[in-house]
């Protein structure tokens, strides 16, 4: 018989840097889960990733106070800012000059990485979604 699920916890934690301090500790403590065990397992699962990369994680809490978790790919904004080599997007999109630029080939690479977590039917659709995200962040999309 399957375990009874009592809830889900969605967090975004830097790769390899999970620790019991907020936001991890309070979120898991409310569900009665072993915080240190999660931190050890998460850090082990993300040690191959670039340190500090934001990793979305969905933690499933069970009635017997055990858990399982699924890591997802980092957010689109992380990849777009990294491709454009900028720290953050434009605070006033459309009013000021673009803060950076990304090429269509960079968008295609990001789309291939993110495709499993995106709500798109094909790679071209995912590229268009990323182009829209880039424009809303104040990045210019160029051919190439």
UniProtKB/Swiss-Prot annotation:
> Keywords, A to Z?
Methylation, Ribonucleoprotein, Ribosomal protein, RNA-binding, rRNA-binding
Q: Name one GO biological process term.
A: translation
Highest taxon of the source? Bacteria
What the entry says about post-translational processing?
One or more lysine residues are methylated.
Molecular-function GO term, any one: large ribosomal subunit rRNA binding
Q: Which PROSITE patterns match?
A: RIBOSOMAL_L11
Gene3D superfamilies xref list: Ribosomal protein L11, C-terminal domain, Ribosomal protein L11/L12, N-terminal domain
Which GO CC terms are listed, alphabetically?
cytosolic large ribosomal subunit
The UniProt entry, under Pfam families, shows: Ribosomal_L11 (PF00298), Ribosomal_L11_N (PF03946)
Subunit structure, per the record?
A: Part of the ribosomal stalk of the 50S ribosomal subunit. Interacts with L10 and the large rRNA to form the base of the stalk. L10 forms an elongated spine to which L12 dimers bind in a sequential fashion forming a multimeric L10(L12)X complex.
* Primary role: Forms part of the ribosomal stalk which helps the ribosome interact with GTP-bound translation factors.
According to its UniProt record, which protein family does this protein belong to? Belongs to the universal ribosomal protein uL11 family.
Q: Which PANTHER family match?
A: 60S RIBOSOMAL PROTEIN L12, LARGE RIBOSOMAL SUBUNIT PROTEIN UL11M
Task: List the HAMAP family.
Answer: Ribosomal_uL11
What's the protein name? Large ribosomal subunit protein uL11
What species is given as this protein's source? Granulibacter bethesdensis (strain ATCC BAA-1260 / CGDNIH1)
């Amino acid at each position: 018989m399957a375990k009874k699920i009592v809830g889900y916890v969605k967090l975004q934690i830097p790769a390899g840097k999970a620790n019991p301090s907020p936001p991890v500790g309070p979120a898991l403590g409310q569900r009665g889960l072993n915080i240190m065990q999660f931190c050890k397992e998460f850090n082990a699962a993300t040690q191959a990733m670039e340190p500090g990369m934001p990793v979305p994680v969905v933690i499933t809490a069970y009635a017997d106070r055990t858990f399982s978790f699924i890591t997802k790919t980092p957010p689109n904004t992380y990849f777009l800012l990294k491709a454009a080599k900028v720290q953050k997007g434009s605070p006033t999109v459309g009013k000021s000059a673009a803060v950076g630029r990304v090429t269509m080939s960079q968008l295609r690479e990001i789309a291939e990485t993110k495709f499993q977590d995106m709500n798109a039917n094909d790679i071209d659709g995912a590229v268009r979604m990323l182009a829209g995200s880039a424009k809303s962040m104040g990045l210019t999309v160029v051919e190439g």
